[in-house]
Regions:
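A conserved SF2-helicase RecA2
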Residues: 278-307, 313-315, 427-433, 437-484
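Walker A/P-loop
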Residues: 118, 132-157
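Conserved RecA-like P-loop NTPase helicase motor core
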Residues: 375-472
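Conserved pre-motif I regulatory segment
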Residues: 39, 45-55, 81-139
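Conserved helicase ATPase core of P-loop NTP-dependent helicases/translocases
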Residues: 174, 186-198, 351, 361-362, ...
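Conserved helix/coil segment N-terminal to the catalytic DExD/H
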Residues: 192-234, 245-254, 404
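Conserved interdomain hinge at the start of the Helicase C-terminal
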Residues: 153-154, 316-355, 361-366
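Post-DEXD/H (motif II) to motif III coupling segment of the RecA-like Helicase ATP-binding lobe
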Residues: 69, 233-234, 239-305, 469
Length: 484
């Protein structure tokens, strides 16, 4: 039996001539049930099966699903004829060395200010690994200098065309732009009210790209993603675990599907099969991993210790949201937590991460002038000013929501990191700890405080987090606290 495999572009492909039974088998093999489907009305009403699929009954699938598909076709006795519509690119690079940017100097606010920019051994290894595999993901721990790695890759791609770097939030756009400018790269940004075109490298958020395409479709502007991607040979996604958002998958497998060089960096590859496959479909397979523990052993990251404070609460709620509302708004708990945070801050700058704005406001109200609350509504520049102040201050308390500060923000001089009810998301917990373990001139150790409860759902979530701490090799101990 024969089947034709049509490679439409870098990520999308289609099989023609497969028997119905084979298509059903493949569709079932590449179909995953989404755990959150139980809460979606369409699933409850029986209008949706609660699954996400990577092979359609029409034969459409993704190039990075072929390692799963081809062995099944082989078993079924199919011969595969290939029709390749991809644009051909001859990509060759010299091996990168530590001296790539040695003619540039570190900026004033860097621990090595004024010294030449020399890449570390592990950064050179990561960069060369990417150059050998033009479509791949690497799991690189927070604090490894991912922005410098991204800049080196953008620089290496200049010979072939433009690069687009997609980051998860506005703070990271400006942070990445500053590093690119310091390294002498021709860079522009696309987000909010700054829309710069015609630069060799463009840094943007996935939200701004999504809005661009929507406005183009609605006839509100003359350019869309296809025009934006002209002459682009490389798309990089920083903190790629955010790429499981459907929007980003749609971007990378839609308007950006002809871009040949596709790289993803993240501190945390998601655990769930469907989330991981969504990333692999968009960018490529995971080829390398560099853990925070390895970087701690090398002396690049600060050592840490997780102190779990399990507050004893004799309350019972039917669902997690109601329980969380109690745990983050109860006045006795907030009084106890603010007193605890005040004591911690005497030992150095403290970053407190909370799930809800109301909890953050409740804590800052009690902590008074010594604390500042940072949420998504604060302007990006004002947030940056607060983060920068930490490099000078000694007993500053920053209270922030997980969404704002848990990803990619560079605040090295944090001596205490407080996680209030961090939940059970592997990505959130590990990325949040990444905020604390960056090294500074006067810091090689950080205390992490996991404030949780003995209440039903909180207790379950702690069981999950203990697994994460063990896997990441972060030492932890649990103390039960009767705070009332």
């Amino acid at each position: 039996m024969k089947t034709k495999l049509i490679l439409k572009d870098e990520v999308n492909c289609k099989f023609e001539g497969l028997a119905l039974t084979t298509r059903r088998k493949l569709e079932k093999k590449l179909k995953f049930f989404l755990p959150h489907a139980f809460h979606v009305p369409a699933y409850k009403l029986g209008r949706w099966d609660g699954c996400v699929g990577y092979f359609t009954m029409g034969g459409s699938t993704f190039v990075n699903c072929l390692p799963t598909i081809l062995p099944i076709l082989d078993e079924e006795g199919y011969g595969v004829e290939i029709e390749d519509h991809r644009q051909h690119h001859e990509l060759k690079w010299d091996t990168v060395t530590q001296e790539l940017f040695s003619d540039r100097q570190w900026p004033a606010n860097h621990p090595a200010a004024g010294q030449p920019v020399v890449l570390r051994d592990y950064q050179v290894k990561v960069i060369n690994e990417f150059l050998q595999t033009p479509q791949c993901l690497q799991e690189i721990a927070t604090g490894a200098g991912k922005t410098l790695i991204t800049a080196a890759l953008s620089y290496m791609c200049e010979a072939y065309g433009r690069s687009i770097v997609i980051v998860p939030n506005k703070d990271l756009v400006t942070q990445t732009e500053a590093d690119y400018i310091n390294l002498g790269l021709d860079v522009g940004v696309y987000f909010g009210d700054r829309k710069e075109f015609g630069k060799t490298h463009t840094i943007c958020t996935w939200q701004s790209l999504n809005i661009m395409e929507k406005r183009f479709r609605d006839g509100e502007q003359d350019w869309g993603l296809h025009a934006f991607a002209e002459d682009v040979v490389c798309v990089m996604v920083d903190e790629v675990h955010q790429a499981k958002a459907d929007v980003l998958k749609k971007l990378l497998t839609g308007a950006f599907s002809n871009i040949p060089i596709r790289w993803g960096l993240t501190g945390t590859i998601p655990k769930a099969d469907h989330e991981r496959l969504s990333l692999e479909v968009s960018l490529g397979e995971v080829t390398n991993s560099l853990s925070a523990h390895e970087l701690q052993d090398m002396g690049v990251l600060a050592q840490c210790e997780v102190n779990v404070l399990q507050l004893q609460d004799s309350v019972s709620y039917g669902n997690y949201q109601s329980e969380l509302t109690y745990l983050t708004t109860n006045t006795t708990r907030l009084d106890y937590m603010s007193g605890l945070i005040e004591k911690m801050a005497q030992g150095g700058n403290t970053l407190v991460l909370v799930d809800r704005i109301s909890a953050g406001e409740g804590l800052v109200e009690r902590l008074g002038d010594s604390a500042v609350f940072i949420s998504g509504s604060m302007k990006s520049k004002n947030r940056k000013d607060e983060y920068d102040e930490v490099s000078e201050a000694d007993n500053k308390i920053i209270v922030a929501t997980y969404g704002v500060a848990a990803v990619g923000i560079n605040i090295p001089r944090i001596f205490n990191l407080v996680l209030v009810e961090p939940g059970k998301s592997f990505v959130r917990v590990i990325q949040s700890i990444g905020r604390g373990i960056r090294k500074a001139q006067d810091k090689d150790h950080v205390q992490i405080w996991d404030i949780t409860s003995s209440a039903k759902f909180s207790k379950r979530h702690l069981t999950e987090r203990k697994k994460f701490y063990r896997e990441a090799k972060y030492p932890f101990h649990i103390e039960k606290v009767d705070y009332k």
